[in-house]
């Protein structure tokens, strides 16, 4: 009787032993991670999908992107010059054509000073809109990287600022004598300047550790 029961249970035991390696392989496959995953990424980046790193390959190489970024910034700087003078000439020409009666004050101030201040305001407005005009002209002259959904340049901008935000020092510990160097990475125009920026951030972190006693950095 016991022999017959043992012969009946033996196939079941054999089936369990054959399923064990398969279950182990499934467990091993589920625990393995993709080479493109970033499990150590902070939680704050997962809560903001618009600023997350792309899963696929980047549309541009980093040297090419940094070179284009430098050109775009140069365009923004150069266009600020004509827009500043344009605002000055337009504002000065308009307010110079107005009749100014010294006996009629504007908010208790003589019209000459009010018109002069308004002219300077037009000049400042032209200076402020210069970078926007330069960025627009740069996009029009580089349609292959500035157009698309999303545009290649926009993808690289997001990836660049993601790396800047991830590697820059914590600004909460800055002081007048120890300011965070290049907080937005505006001076980065090449890979060498990016490495220098990383070194500057590391130096700042060391200064913050020794300059803020009692803080667990």
UniProtKB/Swiss-Prot annotation:
Keywords: Membrane, Mitochondrion, Mitochondrion inner membrane, Protein transport, Transit peptide, Translocation, Transmembrane, Transmembrane helix, Transport. It comes from the Eukaryota. It is found in: Mitochondrion inner membrane. It holds the Pfam family Pam17. GO terms for cellular component: PAM complex, Tim23 associated import motor. The chain crosses the membrane at residues 78-98, 126-146. Residues 46-55 have a biased composition (Polar residues). The keyword Membrane applies. Residues 33-56 are annotated as: Disordered. Residues 1-28 form a transit peptide. InterPro entries: Pam17. It is a multi-pass membrane protein. Component of the PAM complex, a complex required for the translocation of transit peptide-containing proteins from the inner membrane into the mitochondrial matrix in an ATP-dependent manner. Belongs to the PAM17 family. Component of the PAM complex, at least composed of mtHsp70 (SSC1), MGE1, TIM44, PAM16, PAM17 and PAM18. This is Presequence translocated-associated motor subunit PAM17, mitochondrial.
């Amino acid at each position: 009787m016991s022999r017959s029961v043992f012969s009946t249970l033996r196939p079941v035991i054999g089936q369990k032993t054959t399923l064990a390696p398969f279950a182990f392989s499934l467990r091993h496959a589920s625990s393995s991670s993709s080479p493109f995953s970033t499990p150590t990424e902070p939680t704050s980046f997962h809560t903001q999908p618009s600023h997350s790193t792309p899963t696929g390959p980047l549309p541009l190489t980093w040297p090419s992107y940094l070179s284009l970024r430098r050109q775009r910034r140069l365009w923004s700087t150069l266009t600020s010059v004509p827009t500043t003078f344009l605002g000055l000439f337009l504002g000065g020409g308009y307010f110079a054509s107005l009749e100014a009666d010294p006996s009629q004050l504007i908010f208790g101030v003589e019209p000459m000073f009010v018109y002069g201040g308004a002219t300077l305001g037009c000049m400042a407005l032209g200076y402020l809109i210069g970078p926007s005009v330069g960025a627009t002209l740069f996009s029009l002259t580089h349609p292959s990287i500035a157009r698309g959904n999303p545009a290649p340049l926009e993808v690289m901008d997001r990836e660049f600022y993601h790396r800047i935000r991830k590697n820059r020092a914590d600004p909460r510990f800055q002081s007048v004598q120890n300011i965070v160097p290049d907080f937005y990475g505006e001076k980065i125009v090449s890979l060498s300047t990016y490495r220098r920026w990383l070194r500057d951030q590391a130096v700042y972190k060391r200064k913050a550790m020794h300059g803020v006693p009692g803080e667990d950095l």
